[in-house]
Structure formats: structure tokens, C-alpha cells
Amino acid sequence: MRMSKLYKNKEKENEKPSNEPPIKQDSLKRMSSKFLGNSLNSFDLSGKLEQVDEYLKKYPFIIEFGYKLGIKPSYIVVFGGSALFISLVLGWGAALICNLVGFAYPAYQSFKAVESQGHAETKLWLTYWVVFSLFFFIEYLIDIILFWIPFYYVIKLLFLLYLYMPQVRGAETVYNYIIRPILLKHEKTIDDTVHKISQTATNHLNQFTGNIAEKLVQEGVRRRNV
């Protein structure tokens, strides 16, 4: 009996209301809406789009294209970027997009650098092609593994842009800190190997062409005698 009374008294003590006032649902809603409003105000979407429109004035063809469609140029960039991202994620023409970014644009810029005879720009694009060639070779060797990496084409596109974007010039960083030290260390070995291979190939080619020429001469002599 005493134990049951003690147990009941403890239950009553636990059931006593606490002195702390409960948080009302209305106050929670106001707090959440205030937080959301502050977040949206801190990220001024219209202001960001206006900045994009201002930047796109450097590219008249985008301005003209937007004027024909009846929309702001920033919308074209947003829609185009979204479509590009979806294509890369789903693999729709992802290889073509990466080839355009990795081959076509750098090739045209290399042409402009050569024609302008600008030493700095020519060096930049030569550096890019050295890094890109190594990247292409490694990609070819481990293509089966790369197939299973999620969002690989997105990563590849960002890496290619990183290599030649003027704001970062990533190709120079990769070349100076990774490729250049390795090539300088093994330059003599590489040169000797290339020289031996080219000399061997030249000897085999000369021997092959010599055998063909000899057979042609013998065939000509045989036909004359007939």
C-alpha cells in the first residue's frame, strides 16, 4: 500500500505543469516566415539577373537573340545553363558538349593567338594543349572506370573550363606543378627513347621501301625478257 501511494504521488509530481510557457504555433510560423523572408532578401534574384544582363551587353548576339524571343538575355543564360546541366547529368549529347568545349573553342582561340602573334596567349594555349593531351590519354586508359563515376561529364566540363578560363588559367597550374617537374626529371630518357623508336621505324621503312623497289625492278626486267 505504501509503495502504491508513493508511486501515485510521483506520477502527480510529474504531471505538474512546468513554469516555462509553451511555445505557440503562431510564433513558430512567424519565426519561420521571417527567416525565409530574410533569406530571400539576402539573395536578390532580380538583382543578380540584372547583373547578368549588364554583363551580357558585351555579347550583342545574345542581346539580339533575346530581343527576337521577347525575353531578357539573362533568361537565355539561365535556361541554357539549366538545359546544359540536365543534358550532362542524363548523358544526352554530353560527349559532344565536352568535345566542343575541349576541342573546338580552344582550337579557334589557338588560331587567333597564332595570327595575333601574342607570345603570352600562344604560350597559354600551348600549355593548355599539353595538359589536355595528357588528360585525354589518361581518360582513354581508364575509360571503363570513368563510366561508373556519377556526374562524370559535369566534372569533366568544369575541369576543361578550369584549364583555360582567364580568371584561373588552371592549365598553367597543372603544367607548372605536375607535368613540368616530371618531364624535366625524365627529359633525357624520353628523348633517347623517342630517338631509338624513330630510328628503328626509319630503318624498317627504308628496308620495306627498298624491298618493294627491288621487286618492282625485277618484275620490270622479267616482263621485258618475256
UniProtKB/Swiss-Prot annotation:
Compositional bias of type Basic and acidic residues: which residue ranges? 8-18
Q: Where is this region: Disordered?
A: 1-25
- Which residue spans traverse the membrane? 73-92, 95-113, 124-140, 144-162
Q: What happens when the gene is disrupted?
A: During the asexual blood stage, parasites have a slower growth, a delayed ring-to-trophozoite transition and display abnormal endoplasmic reticulum architecture and an enlarged digestive vacuole. In infected mice, the number of male and female gametes is reduced, resulting in a severe decrease in the number of midgut oocytes and salivary gland sporozoites in the mosquito. Sporozoites have a slight reduction in motility and the invasion of host hepatocytes is slightly delayed. In C57BL/6 mice, parasitemia is reduced and the parasite fails to induce experimental cerebral malaria (ECM).
Its localization reads: Endoplasmic reticulum membrane
Chief place where the protein resides: endoplasmic reticulum
What does its UniProt record remark on the domains? The N-terminus is important for protein stability. The C-terminus is dispensable for the formation of membrane tubules.
Q: What does this protein do?
A: Required to generate and maintain the structure of the tubular endoplasmic reticulum network and the digestive (food) vacuole. Induces high curvature in membranes and causes membrane tubule formation.
Any idea what this protein is called?
A: Protein YOP1 homolog
Annotated source species: Plasmodium berghei (strain Anka)
